[in-house]
Design a protein with these regions (language model features):
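Non-cytosolic coordination micro-motifs
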Residues: 55-58, 63, 122-180
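Bacterial N-terminal signal peptides that target proteins for export
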Residues: 7-27
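C-terminal segment of classical bacterial N-terminal signal peptides
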Residues: 31-40
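Long, charged/polar, surface-exposed segments that mediate recognition or autoinhibition
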Residues: 90-148
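Polar/charged alpha-helical tracts
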Residues: 22, 42, 70, 74, ...
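N-terminal secretory signal peptides
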Residues: 44-103
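Short, surface-exposed loop and linker segments with low hydrophobicity and enrichment for Pro/Ser/Thr
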Residues: 42-51, 103-116, 149-168
Length: 180
């Protein structure tokens, strides 16, 4: 009995260390892409842009729409539109995972979910490949259709957005933790 408990505890520690390793790797690998970023609009993105926004898009961070609205407002100025339950910010010249980000969106108060998303100048397959190469996170296709969604184990989704890709992480505002 004690051996089984020890094995489960050891396995849990291994999973935690693996997650911590992936986050550290993501931070290290996203940082080189920051050197080529050009700021647009009112200000340049903070040096932490690739880490903060990248990890949120990968569903590796908690989502807080107020925090990300303020962060994006500071980096890019006023949103250029409010549509579909989201504030849209122009982010031309920004790069994450070696891919150009054209727009970033964060939910407004009308949305039933907290989410952050980005429109990427590239195909969903190219974005999926870039993320896998940069941080080791893999996406699986929901089905074999041409416009199939791709989803990571953490819940991040890559979809078609006209001729570009859109990546997002969404969490319901109404989910509450279960009893332990």
């Amino acid at each position: 009995m004690a051996s089984t408990h020890h094995q489960r505890r050891h396995a849990h520690q291994g999973v935690c260390l693996n997650i911590i390793h992936r986050i550290a790797l993501a931070c290290a690998l996203l940082a080189p892409g920051l050197a080529g970023m050009n700021g647009v609009a009112n200000a340049a993105p903070a040096a932490t842009f690739g880490i903060e926004v990248g990890n949120a898009l990968l569903c590796l961070n908690q989502l807080n729409s107020k925090y990300f609205y303020d962060y994006l407002f500071e980096a890019f100025g006023k949103p250029y539109k409010t549509e579909g339950g989201a504030y849209w910010f122009k982010a031309a010249g920004s790069n994450i995972w070696g891919m150009e980000i054209t727009d970033i969106l964060v939910n407004d108060s009308s949305s039933p979910a907290d989410f952050i998303g980005a429109v990427v100048n590239g195909t969903p397959q190219a974005l999926s490949d870039a993320i896998t190469k940069s941080v080791g996170i893999r996406y699986t296709l929901d089905d074999a259709g041409k416009y199939s969604l791709r989803q990571s184990q953490a819940g991040s989704v890559i979809a078609y957005a006209d001729t570009k890709a859109k990546i997002y992480c969404a969490k319901s505002k109404y989910l509450v933790p279960g009893k332990q």
